[in-house]
Amino acid sequence: MAGLEVLFASAAPAITCAQDALVCFLHWEVVTHGYYGLGAGDQPGPNDKKSELLPVEWNSNKDLYVLRYESKDGSRKLLVKAVTVENSMIINVLEHGSQQVSDLTLNLNDYIDSEHLVDFHRVYKNSEELRSRIVSGIITPIHEQWEKANLSPHREFPPATAREVDPLRIHPQHPHTSRQPTWCDPLGPFAVGGEDLDPFGCRRGGMIVDPLRSGFPRALIDPSSGLPNRLPPGAVPPGARFDPFGPIGTSPSGPNPDHLPPPGYDDMYL
């Protein structure tokens, strides 16, 4: 573990608890994987500088350690947070580029001897296991996700036009184009019987007349039919779907003469 003893010697005067010793080990492991320490805290400060040593005030808060790192080639930045919870330490690492997060929980009593904090040769227990857990739980997941993000191809899509993205656009029912369709207009009002005149042409109206599209004026339906009085103007809006109150064609003025029986219809001798 070349370099860890030198790092511990430089930080030994500030190490006063088990979590300090564990963060020192964690810092060394991150540095050996190609990173420089930048500083302490979430945000960059005026005293930030790339260094393999622990930054100033790295352990000012014994319950929450926040350290920032940058790879030697400047392509990756890490934000490391270590939270002390009773006899455990929860380590959380965020890689800014890929937003990949990894975390690891360590038991302080399993790896740190609190009785020998100033003795480098006795302070760390199971150091190989500790190193393996840091690498597999934090370093490797961060690097794998970062490499995967760089290898995946970036798909580029052409910019969408206003016609494509307008959700309120109503498609025309009969768009007028310069090129006319090869079929005839089925809505032509005078197409009745056209197929009989030109059997080899396109299909047109047959012998069944559509009363709504016959081309002749239609009688208006009186909405007041069946009522003693007429409805006031505007009671039925133009074009509204409306069922008359009574039979169509009746008039409140009285029956039509055609509706009366002929004179003497009941005289058998007439």
UniProtKB/Swiss-Prot annotation:
The modification Omega-N-methylarginine is found at R204, R230. Residues 220-270 are annotated as: Disordered. Its main location: cytoplasm. The modification Asymmetric dimethylarginine is found at R218. Pfam families: PI31_Prot_C, PI31_Prot_N. One of its GO terms (biological process) is negative regulation of proteasomal protein catabolic process. It comes from the Eukaryota. The modification N-acetylalanine is found at A2. Coiled coil: none annotated. The modification Phosphoserine is found at S152, S251. Residues 254-264 have a biased composition (Pro residues). Residues 2-150 are annotated as: Important for homodimerization and interaction with FBXO7. One of its GO terms (cellular component) is endoplasmic reticulum. Keywords: Acetylation, Cytoplasm, Endoplasmic reticulum, Methylation, Phosphoprotein, Proteasome. Belongs to the proteasome inhibitor PI31 family. Plays an important role in control of proteasome function. Inhibits the hydrolysis of protein and peptide substrates by the 20S proteasome. Also inhibits the activation of the proteasome by the proteasome regulatory proteins PA700 and PA28. This is Proteasome inhibitor PI31 subunit. The lineage of its organism: Eukaryota, Metazoa, Chordata, Craniata, Vertebrata. The gene is PSMF1.
